[in-house]
Each structure stands twice: as structure tokens, then as C-alpha cells.
Amino acid sequence: MAPSRKFFVGGNWKMNGRKQSLGELIGTLNAAKVPADTEVVCAPPTAYIDFARQKLDPKIAVAAQNCYKVTNGAFTGEISPGMIKDYGATWVVLGHSERRHVFGESDELIGQKVAHALAEGLGVIACIGEKLDEREAGITEKVVFEQTKVIADNVKDWSKVVLAYEPVWAIGTGKTATPQQAQEVHEKLRGWLKSNVSDAVAQSTRIIYGGSVTGATCKELASQPDVDGFLVGGASLKPEFVDIINAKQ
């Protein structure tokens, strides 16, 4: 990892927890040592964004797990970047595979959300990744490059964007991409940014890995030169998330 890229660890709590259990988790995180050279962001369920921001130590930022592409309106069940900021959250996760595959979000919609969230001043954790059949068909690069292009077409300021590579076959399955598999895709993504955006953006943009990251797997993954951090699912609800936060130490 280049010295200029601050290690980034995101915890995606998904649709999990209640005030009591999340309060206990927050207590563990508040007591934890967060290295000065590591940025930590937690993404609670929408209902608990305000609760998390009030309870979490300021050293840990808060993200929403999704947002819509416009400011206000008749969009039942949706949340806008302005509302997310009003809660005190500063990031949003967009394009997660569960949004793509469970809720049918298209690349086009995700790109529109990215553009609006950035215009409203949020940082964006933009997710990309291939399914198992796509990896087995040898089209991993094609898939992730196409997804990245739609995101890139909607980004003016890359300093507010973190790219999260999440192979869909490794999310919640217990299967983790090997450090070599992760590094290979991250290196190719950085090459794509260099060729299609700029060398400066390629060098400065953090590309993080997600997919069954645990306290046991994080150190070797973190040692890869193009792995700049993690987006953690299930393990972010457990005390081992502290070990993952400290993976570079």
C-alpha cells in the first residue's frame, strides 16, 4: 500500500442488531485502540444511524448502507444523502452486491446514486465484484471494469471515493479470496484507473477488499501492496472487528 493511502476499515452491520446489542458493540469499539494511520467507518441499519453517531467515539465515522439519487420526494422507504448528513453520518455504501442482486439495482442507478451522494458532500464506498459463475467463466476483469466505469463516469472528486472489491462468491459464504486473488484484482483495478482516469487517481484511491474477512484472514490480506483496507460484514458485529482494525499493526 502506498504511504499516501490511509488504511480504511468499514464495518457493514447490514440488517442486524438492536439498541442493546449495538450499544454493547459500540462500547467495545469505543474502548479499542484505533491506529492513527487507519480510518474506521461503521454502517449501521438506517434506523440506528442517529443512535450510532451519538454513541460512537468521534474517531469512528458513520455511514449509511444506501441512499437514493435525489434530494426529496415521493420515494417511499428511501433515504437521501441530505438526511444521512443530518444524522451526522459522513459516508454511504453504494452498489453493494446485496443491493444489486437482492434488490435488482442496476449499474446505471448505482452510478446516479454515486453522483448525487458526492454532490451532496458524502464520501462514497462504491462496491464492485463478480459472481462465482463469472469468475469461473474467466470474465472477472470484464465485470469489475464495467462496474467501475459506471462509477467513474459519475465521479468528479476521487478524494471522497473508496472502491470496495467484493467477490460475490466470498460474501457471507466463509470463502475468502486468497491474498493473491485479492491482490491480482486490486492491481488490475488500479491499472484501469491509471488508464481511464489518471495516474494520480490510481495512486491515491483506496481499493479495499470485502468478502468473509475475519480476524484470522485480515493480516495476510492487509500485507498485499494494493489492498488498502476492508469492508467487513459479519465480523464487524463481533469483538474481532478490533483485530481487523489493527490488521496493519
From Swiss-Prot:
Reactions performed catalytically: dihydroxyacetone phosphate = methylglyoxal + phosphate; D-glyceraldehyde 3-phosphate = dihydroxyacetone phosphate
Gene Ontology BP term (one): glycerol catabolic process
3'-nitrotyrosine modification, residue list: Y68, Y209
Covalent link (Glycyl lysine isopeptide (Lys-Gly) (interchain with G-Cter in SUMO1)) residue numbers: K142
Positions of modified residues (N6-succinyllysine): K149, K156, K194
Compartments (UniProt record): Cytoplasm
Main location per the UniProt record: cytoplasm
PROSITE patterns the UniProt entry points to: TIM_1 (PS00171), TIM_2 (PS51440)
A Pfam family recorded for this sequence: TIM
Protein name, per record: Triosephosphate isomerase
Gene name of this polypeptide: TPI1
